[in-house]
Amino acid sequence: MNALPIRTAAPSGHSGGHSSTGTHVPVLLNEVLETLSPAPGGVFLDGTFGGGGYTRAILDTAEDSTVWAVDRDPAAITRGEALAARYRGRLHLIQGNFSQMASLLTDRGVNALDGIVLDIGVSSFQIDDPDRGFSFRTDGPLDMRMAGEGTSAADLIARLPEAEIANILYELGEERKSRQIARAIVSARAEEPITTTGRLASIIRCVVPPDRSGIDPATRSFQALRIAVNDELGELERALQQATNLLQPGGRLVIVSFHSLEDRIVKRFMNDAAGNAPSPSRYDPRGLVARTEPRFRLITSKAVRPGTAEQNANPRSRSARLRAIECLRRETTP
C-alpha cells in the first residue's frame, strides 16, 4: 500500500496535532497506515475517532472502504459530522465506548472487520480545551470526564480517603511521592474544595519539585486521576478481547498507546494471542493441557516509536508506542 506522508504537526495534542491548515494529524500516521494496510472495499473500525485523522487516512487510502468510527466523547462525534458528509455512505459515526464495540457493531449488522485501530488515551482536542479539565497547563474546572458523565476528578479527590488517593497516584501514575501528594490534597480540601486544575497542580508542585527532565511535576498525578475517572485500563482490557473476536482472517488490530501501563497490557495481550506466552512450569498441572494453535501472529516484534522529526514537531508524541497483530483464523463456535 502507499502510505500517506506525515504532515507537519504543531505540538498541540497527546494523541495528535494540527497542521497549518487546522487538519488533525494523528500520531504515527504513516506507521499506522503501513501496519493496518487497508485494502479497497474493506470494513474498518476506528475505535477512538477523536479528530478523525486515522479515519480520514483510511478512507483516502482504500477505495470504497467503510469506516465505523466510535468515540465516547459527544464533541468528537459532532466534529465528525462534516467528515461523514464528505465521505457519504462510507463513514458511520457511533457515540459509545470502544469497550462496547462488539454490541455497537452487531446491533448495526456488522459482524466482521478487516482492521481495527485504537489510539488509547486523551485526545488533543480534550487536552487543549481548558473547560474539559484535563490539562495542568491551563486553569479550568477539574473534570477529566471523556464522556461528560459520571464522577469527575473533583468529585473523586473530594470523597476518597487519603490512602485511596495515594494508591491511585502510585498505581495509575507511577508517582513515587504519591503519599505526600495525597496528604497535601486531603489537607488542602479541608480548607476549601479543590475544584480547578490550577489549584490541584499548585498543590502537587508544592510537594514534587521540578527535576532535570523538564516534565511538569503534576504530569503523573493528572494522568492517574484521568485514568481512574474514565476507567481507561478496564476499558482497554475489555476492548482487546472484543476486537480479536471481530477480526476476520487477514484483519489487523493496530494499537497506539502513550504510557507504560497501557503498553504492558497491550504487549501481554498480543503475545498471548500470538501464542508467545511463557511456557508454564512442568510442575504446573495447567501445563498438561494441550495448547491450541494461535489465532493471531505478531506484526510488530517490538513497539514502533515516532521518528525524530515527528517527536520534534509534536513533543507529546514522544511516549507513543505502536503494536499490532494479524488474525489467522476466526474463533469457531461449537
Curated annotation (Swiss-Prot):
EC number per UniProt: 2.1.1.199
Tagged with keyword Coiled coil: no
Transmembrane segments: none
Gene Ontology MF annotations: rRNA (cytosine-N4-)-methyltransferase activity
Enzymatic reactions: cytidine(1402) in 16S rRNA + S-adenosyl-L-methionine = N(4)-methylcytidine(1402) in 16S rRNA + S-adenosyl-L-homocysteine + H(+)
Membership in a protein family: Belongs to the methyltransferase superfamily. RsmH family.
Function text: Specifically methylates the N4 position of cytidine in position 1402 (C1402) of 16S rRNA.
Name of this protein: Ribosomal RNA small subunit methyltransferase H
Organism per entry: Granulibacter bethesdensis (strain ATCC BAA-1260 / CGDNIH1)
Gene: rsmH
